[in-house]
């Protein structure tokens, strides 16, 4: 390693980094970028975001005394270079793997990971809390939050900045802007002006003038507005927004000019009050395929970096593909069907729909709360909104789900992707709770397809209904079953897959094939329940009468899930039967492959069989 990475091989912590001369930092950044590409191409993971913040990461750890100074990364996709520089370089081959290092900053993993993350737009709120605590204790530590131009569009980020501006707390927010959406004013002049506005002379004059003008409020307000206007003209019109929130805006500066980054950050480290640094970067920087197609190279499987070709592994369509195709099929005949996504177009299978039906497609950015209530408004106006959202992100709009959809009994369809175990992204991304938090909401109909054909029929059934509906389906490839013509399902009715004896397995969702292997092997009854709400109560009652053991199977937390619903009903009708609930345990599910998680928690055929045998013994 020393031959290929002579500088990086010496860096076991930021303390080692800070021993380097400034003249070595560019060479280190080049080595870090190459190492990141070599590492991720062998393991899979998030690539383009990390490539874009290499210089910024080096500069931050060079200027700030981490971990004494607190560095917080929003979301965490871009934190791979941070992990490499903070003692985890030689563990990068384990990232996103079972018992390996976490794909996002994780507090239990390193003192350099101040905040555990995975969802977006949380950094400034947490950073403000950390900064306030440091100020109360006179700790002298600095707080820095790095947030992307996607994450900063979320309401939570602006709520935090509004509060920070009011408190006038010492903290730095860095906007990592890797799009052209905010500003294009990047260049030598802007870098020079950023150094002036962050420098000690300008800052001293600014702060001294404020103290004098505090006694003359009218003139002080005029000067403040003049400064905001000047920055808006020189830097970016967007600077006015952040200045109005109470931040001192600097930028935009070139996020790949490490010399300018170090100079500007060194100046800003000494500034008081809320500071905002706008840094322009290029996602995928330094690797041409990722620069040209940052979306495809955002998260990558293992690939050959020399060719830059990503493997085409999909023979069977994914459940997301099935959803996207259904949406296009429906939109061909109904201009009132509307597709909504909170910044997950590619992941939710909506690319084709967005291109073919642009007037019926809305990407509301990272704004799950808004997405749900926006759908409510469309439904009130007579449209048929379909909200495509990951299970883990629907959690962020729970009040809107209840207050704006369910109470008004509006016909909004929720296509809940990544329900159940998602694999390598770990605790923050598992779809473990949606059945539990939706099942208690009145007016909701909840469906769990066992395969893509059933999913197809359920989506159509939801389309025909005039009440809120949710269809939850897993990450990954479907089963390869041919789709039948669309037809409505009988709401709340299950279907018996195999009629057996003694044991009845009530399956909710896509684990049906695992359950079927066990049922056929032992001649157990197997039921595809289809609906979590309403349950097929008649069938459950009959099965309780005719079988000595009932088993529920679901890819959701056992607490409050589908099995709990069956148990509650049996208690209600006084049929106290032996009942085995198989699902996800009371813990946050760590990273691994989906198959490893199924085996670990007894959700594969072997585990199901063992749990039933234990109950029968």
Curated annotation (Swiss-Prot):
Q: What does UniProt give as GO cellular component? A: cytosol
Q: Which PROSITE patterns match?
A: TRANSKETOLASE_1, TRANSKETOLASE_2
| Cofactor binding: number and manner | Binds 1 Mg(2+) ion per subunit.
Q: Which reaction does it catalyse?
A: D-glyceraldehyde 3-phosphate + pyruvate + H(+) = 1-deoxy-D-xylulose 5-phosphate + CO2
The EC code for this enzyme is: 2.2.1.7
Query: So what does this one do?
Result: Catalyzes the acyloin condensation reaction between C atoms 2 and 3 of pyruvate and glyceraldehyde 3-phosphate to yield 1-deoxy-D-xylulose-5-phosphate (DXP).
Origin organism is: Haemophilus ducreyi (strain 35000HP / ATCC 700724)
Family (UniProt): Belongs to the transketolase family. DXPS subfamily.
UniProt keyword Phosphoprotein, yes or no: no
The identity of this protein, by name, is 1-deoxy-D-xylulose-5-phosphate synthase
Its assembly, as annotated, is: Homodimer.
Binding residue positions for thiamine diphosphate: 77, 118-120, 150-151, 178, 287, 368
Cofactor(s) listed in the protein's UniProt record: Mg(2+); thiamine diphosphate
**Which positions in this protein are listed as binding Mg(2+)?**
149, 178
Q: Name the keywords, alphabetized.
A: Isoprene biosynthesis, Magnesium, Metal-binding, Thiamine biosynthesis, Thiamine pyrophosphate, Transferase
Enzyme class name: transferase
* CDD domains found in the cross-reference section: TPP_DXS (cd02007), TPP_PYR_DXS_TK_like (cd07033)
SMART domains in alphabetical order: Transket_pyr (SM00861)
Pathway field: Metabolic intermediate biosynthesis; 1-deoxy-D-xylulose 5-phosphate biosynthesis; 1-deoxy-D-xylulose 5-phosphate from D-glyceraldehyde 3-phosphate and pyruvate: step 1/1
């Amino acid at each position: 390693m020393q031959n290929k990475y002579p500088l990086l091989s010496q860096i076991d912590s930021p303390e080692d980094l800070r021993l380097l001369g400034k003249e070595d930092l560019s060479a280190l950044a080049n080595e870090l970028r190459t190492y990141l590409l070599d590492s991720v191409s062998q393991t899979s993971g998030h690539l383009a975001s990390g490539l874009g913040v290499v210089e910024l990461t080096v500069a931050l750890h060079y200027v700030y005394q981490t971990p004494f100074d607190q560095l917080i990364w929003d979301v965490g996709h871009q934190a791979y270079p941070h992990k490499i520089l903070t003692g985890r370089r030689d563990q990068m081959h384990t990232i996103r793997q079972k018992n390996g290092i976490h794909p996002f900053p994780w507090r239990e993993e390193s003192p350099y990971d101040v905040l555990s993350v995975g969802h977006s737009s949380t950094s400034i709120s947490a950073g403000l809390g950390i900064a306030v605590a440091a100020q109360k204790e006179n700790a002298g530590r600095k707080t820095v939050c790095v947030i992307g131009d996607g994450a900063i569009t979320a309401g939570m980020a602006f709520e935090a900045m509004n509060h920070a501006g009011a408190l006038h707390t010492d903290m730095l927010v860095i906007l990592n802007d890797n799009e052209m959406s905010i500003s294009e004013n990047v260049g030598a002049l802007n870098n020079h002006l950023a150094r002036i506005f962050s420098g000690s002379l300008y800052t001293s004059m600014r702060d001294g003038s404020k103290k004098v003008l505090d006694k003359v409020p009218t003139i002080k307000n005029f000067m403040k507005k003049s400064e905001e206007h000047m920055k808006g003209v020189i830097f970016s019109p967007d600077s006015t927004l952040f200045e109005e929130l109470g931040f001192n805006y600097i930028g935009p500066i070139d996020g790949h000019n490490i010399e300018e980054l170090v100079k500007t950050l060194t100046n800003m480290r000494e500034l008081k009050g809320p500071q905002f640094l706008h840094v322009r970067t290029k996602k995928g920087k330094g690797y041409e395929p990722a620069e040209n197609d940052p979306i495809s190279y955002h998260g990558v499987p293992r690939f050959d970096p020399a060719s830059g070709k990503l493997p085409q592994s999909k023979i069977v369509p994914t459940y997301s593909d099935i959803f996207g195709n259904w949406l296009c099929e429906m939109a061909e005949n109904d201009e009132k069907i509307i597709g909504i996504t909170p910044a997950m177009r590619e992941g939710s299978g909506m690319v084709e729909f967005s291109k073919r039906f642009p007037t019926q497609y809305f990407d509301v950015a990272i704004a799950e709360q808004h997405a749900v209530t926006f759908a409510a408004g469309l439904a009130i106006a007579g449209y048929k909104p379909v909200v495509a959202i990951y299970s883990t992100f629907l959690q962020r709009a729970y009040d809107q789900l209840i207050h704006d959809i369910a109470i008004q009994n509006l016909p909004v369809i929720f296509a809940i992707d990544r329900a159940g175990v998602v694999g390598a992204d770990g605790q923050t991304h598992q779809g473990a709770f949606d059945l539990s938090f939706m099942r208690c909401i009145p007016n909701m109909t909840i469906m769990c397809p066992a395969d893509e054909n059933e999913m197809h029929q359920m989506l159509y059934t939801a389309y025909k209904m005039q009440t809120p509906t949710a269809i939850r389906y897993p990450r990954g490839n479907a089963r390869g079953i041919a789709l039948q013509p669309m037809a409505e399902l009988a709401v709340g009715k299950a279907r018996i897959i195999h009629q057996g004896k003694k044991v009845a397995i009530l399956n909710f969702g896509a684990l049906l094939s695992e359950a079927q292997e066990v049922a056929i092997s032992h001649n157990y009854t197997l039921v595809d329940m289809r609906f979590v709400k309403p349950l097929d109560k008649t069938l459950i009652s009959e099965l309780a009468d005719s079988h000595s053991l009932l088993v529920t199977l679901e890819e959701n937390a056992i607490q409050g899930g589908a099995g709990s619903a069956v148990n509650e009903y049996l208690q209600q009708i006084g049929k106290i039967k032996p009942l085995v609930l198989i699902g996800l345990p009371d813990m946050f599910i760590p990273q691994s492959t989906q198959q490893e998680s199924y085996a670990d928690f007894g959700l594969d055929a072997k585990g199901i069989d063992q749990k039933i045998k234990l109950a029968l013994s």
